[in-house]
C-alpha cells in the first residue's frame, strides 16, 4: 500500500473521531450525584434507628412534637440497647456523645434530647449534624476537661444538686440525732458522777465513824444500852394498863377530854383526892394540876422515844451521834433531873397534906 494513501486514511479517521467527540460533547460520562458526599456518622444513624424502632418505645421514643427523643428508662437502655448497637453499656458515655454532636437537654426532669437536624421522618437531615471540634490551639487535656464540664453543666447538674440536697438533709438529721444522744449521755454521766461523789462521802463518813468508835471503847456499850432502853420503853408502853379517873373535883370536864384522862400515867385514887381537896387549900389543886401536866409530858416523851426506836438507824442518826459525841450521859442526867422534880412535887404534896387542918 502506498504510504501516502495510508497517511490520508489515518487523517480521515482522526477527523471523524474528533468530529464525533464534538457531537457527543454533552453526553460525556459523569460521576454519580452525591458519590463523593460524606454521609451522617454511624452514631447518629444508629441512634435514629433505635428511636424509630417501635419495639423500643417503652424505653426510648420520639416526643409528641417529633422534634426530640426521650429515654424513659435509662437503666434498661444502658443494660440492653446500648450493648447491642454501641458495644458498651455506659449511659454517661452515650450522653457525652450526644453533647459532642450538639444535642441539648430539653426537660430537666427527664432525659429528653433535641437537635435541629434530628427530626421524626426526616432522616436525610442527619447529614447536617456536624461533630463539634474543640479549638486546635488548646491542649488535649483542657479539651477533655471542657467537654466534661459542659456535659455536667447541661445534663447532670440539676440531678446532682437534688442528690446533694437530699444528702445534706440526711446528714443534718443524723447530726441532730447524734447531738441529742450526746446530751443524754452527758446527763447520764453527770448523774453517775453525783452518785459516785455521794457514795464517796458516805464512805469517808463511815471510815471516820469507825475510827472514832475504835478510839472510844465505851461506844458499843452505850449503843447497846440505848437499844435496851428503847426496847424497855416499847414493852412498857405496850403492856401498861391504865385505870380511868373517876370524879376529880378540881378538873373542869370541859377542859380535859376523856382521851387525855386515859393517857395520863399518874392516876390518883378518888378517895385520896377527896381527902386532900378540902375547902381553903388551893395549893393542893395547883400541885395536882402540875403533876397531871408533868405526866402528860412524860407520856409524850415516851411516845417520841417509841417512834424513834421504831425508825431505822439512818444517816441522820449516825451524823447526830458523831456531832454530839456520844451524849448518852447527858440524856441520863436530864432524866435524873426530871425524876428529882417529881420527888420534890411529891414531898410538897405530902407536906401540904400533913399541915392541912382536920
UniProtKB/Swiss-Prot annotation:
What is the recorded post-translational modification? Exhibits temperature-dependent phosphorylation.
One of the entry's Gene Ontology molecular-function terms is:
sequence-specific DNA binding
Annotated segments matching region Hydrophobic repeat HR-A/B: 164-214
Q: Where is this motif: Bipartite nuclear localization signal?
A: 229-243
Q: Where is this motif: AHA2?
A: 315-324
What's one GO BP annotation on this UniProt entry? cellular response to heat
| CC annotations in GO | cytoplasm; nucleus
Please state, per the UniProt record, what induces or represses the expression of this protein. By heat stress.
Q: Where is this motif: Nuclear export signal?
A: 345-352
Q: Which residues form a coiled coil?
A: 156-243
Query: Where does the signal sequence lie?
Result: none
Could you list this entry's UniProt keywords, alphabetically sorted: Activator, Coiled coil, Cytoplasm, DNA-binding, Nucleus, Phosphoprotein, Stress response, Transcription, Transcription regulation
Q: Where is this motif: AHA1?
A: 265-274
Domain commentary:
The hydrophobic-rich region (HR-A/B) corresponds to the oligomerization domain. AHA motifs are transcriptional activator elements.
Quote the function comment for this protein.
Answer: Transcriptional activator that specifically binds DNA of heat shock promoter elements (HSE).
What quaternary arrangement does the UniProt entry report?
A: Homotrimer.
The family classification in the record reads: Belongs to the HSF family. Class A subfamily.
Q: What is this protein called?
A: Heat stress transcription factor A-2c
Organism from which the protein derives: Oryza sativa subsp. japonica
Amino acid at each position: 500500500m502506498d504510504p501516502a494513501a495510508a497517511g490520508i486514511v489515518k487523517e480521515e479517521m482522526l477527523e471523524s473521531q474528533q468530529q464525533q467527540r464534538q457531537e457527543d460533547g454533552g453526553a460525556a460520562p459523569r460521576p454519580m450525584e452525591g458519590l463523593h458526599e460524606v454521609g451522617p456518622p454511624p452514631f447518629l444513624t444508629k441512634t435514629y434507628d433505635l428511636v424509630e424502632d417501635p419495639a423500643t418505645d417503652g424505653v426510648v421514643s420520639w416526643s409528641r412534637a417529633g422534634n426530640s427523643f426521650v429515654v424513659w428508662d435509662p437503666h434498661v437502655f444502658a443494660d440492653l440497647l446500648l450493648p447491642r448497637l454501641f458495644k458498651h453499656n455506659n449511659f454517661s458515655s452515650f450522653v457525652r456523645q450526644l453533647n459532642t454532636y450538639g444535642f441539648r437537654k430539653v426537660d430537666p426532669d427527664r432525659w429528653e434530647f433535641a437537635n435541629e437536624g434530628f427530626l421524626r421522618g426526616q432522616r436525610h437531615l442527619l447529614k447536617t449534624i456536624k461533630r463539634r471540634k474543640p479549638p486546635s490551639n488548646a491542649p488535649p487535656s483542657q479539651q477533655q476537661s471542657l467537654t466534661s464540664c459542659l456535659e455536667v453543666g447541661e445534663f447532670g447538674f440539676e440531678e446532682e444538686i437534688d442528690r446533694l440536697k437530699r444528702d445534706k438533709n440526711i446528714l443534718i438529721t443524723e447530726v441532730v440525732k447524734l447531738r441529742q444522744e450526746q446530751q443524754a449521755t452527758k446527763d447520764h454521766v453527770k448523774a453517775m458522777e453525783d452518785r459516785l461523789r455521794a457514795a464517796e462521802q458516805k464512805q469517808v463518813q463511815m471510815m471516820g465513824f469507825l475510827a472514832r468508835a475504835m478510839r472510844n471503847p465505851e461506844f458499843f456499850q452505850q449503843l447497846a444500852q440505848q437499844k435496851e432502853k428503847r426496847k424497855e420503853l416499847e414493852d412498857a408502853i405496850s403492856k401498861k394498863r391504865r385505870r380511868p379517873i373517876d370524879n376529880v373535883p378540881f378538873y373542869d370536864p370541859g377542859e380535859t377530854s376523856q382521851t387525855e384522862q386515859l393517857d395520863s400515867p399518874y392516876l390518883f385514887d378518888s378517895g385520896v383526892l377527896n381527902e386532900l381537896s378540902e375547902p381553903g387549900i388551893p395549893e393542893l389543886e395547883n400541885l395536882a394540876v402540875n403533876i397531871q401536866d408533868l405526866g402528860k409530858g412524860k407520856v409524850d416523851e415516851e411516845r417520841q422515844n417509841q417512834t424513834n426506836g421504831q425508825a431505822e438507824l439512818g444517816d441522820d442518826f449516825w451524823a447526830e451521834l458523831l456531832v454530839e459525841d456520844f451524849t448518852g450521859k447527858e440524856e441520863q442526867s436530864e432524866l435524873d433531873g426530871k425524876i428529882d422534880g417529881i420527888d420534890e412535887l411529891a414531898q410538897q404534896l405530902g407536906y401540904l397534906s400533913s399541915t392541912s387542918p382536920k
